[in-house]
Amino acid sequence: MIAIHILLLVFSNIVLPALCINVFVYGTLKKGQSNYHELTNTTHGQAEFITCARTKDPYPMVIATKDKFPFLLNVPGSGQQVYGEIYNVDQNMLDFLDEFEECPDLYQRTSIQLKILKGNGDSEEAFVYSTSTFDPDWLNKPTFSVYDATGDPGNNCVSRE
């Protein structure tokens, strides 16, 4: 009986690591962009920069609204390979991002294959916020591989390849 109590005391002091989830950001949540502060706000949860990456397959990333926010259209095989950043987030941050990205109404969180830009160019899987609910005319808009609202090429991952 004493051994069981000691065992329970030992295990009650162990802090299990937070659930870690990879998320690929390609627009306003990237470092240096207008909503990056949301990823660094610990009241939303935890997020840690992992590396720069690009989509394995091309996707159309378009600027389709007057606000000039990027939309990654969930149409793999069309458009360009999109560059962005992979963050490791906890469940609280993922829940916040779902709400922030108006998931599932505006964006949908889906899994995507990525190519890491540093090292051997390994592949990685991550969640991304893309949309399948868009005006069909958006497919006729110009596509981009990099989003940078500041116009500063130092604020994107392409230069780190």
From Swiss-Prot:
Q: Which Pfam families match?
A: GGACT (PF06094)
Q: What EC designation does it have?
A: 4.3.2.8
Q: Locate the residues binding substrate.
A: 26-29
Which reaction(s) does its UniProt entry say it catalyses? epsilon-(gamma-L-glutamyl)-L-lysine = 5-oxo-L-proline + L-lysine
Q: Which GO terms describe its molecular function?
A: gamma-glutamylaminecyclotransferase activity
Keywords recorded for this protein, A-Z = Lyase
What InterPro entries does the database record attribute to this sequence?
AIG2-like_dom, GGACT, GGCT-like, GGCT-like_sf
Catalytic residues?
A: 101
* GO CC, any one term: cytosol
List this protein's GO terms for biological process.
modified amino acid catabolic process
Instruction: Please describe what this protein does.
Output: May contribute to degradation of proteins cross-linked by transglutaminases by degrading the cross-link between a lysine and a glutamic acid residue. Catalyzes the formation of 5-oxo-L-proline from L-gamma-glutamyl-L-epsilon-lysine.
Q: Which family does it belong to?
A: Belongs to the gamma-glutamylcyclotransferase family.
Q: What is this protein called?
A: Gamma-glutamylaminecyclotransferase A
Q: Which organism is it from?
A: Danio rerio
Lineage, opening ranks: Eukaryota, Metazoa, Chordata, Craniata, Vertebrata
**What gene does this protein come from?**
ggact.1
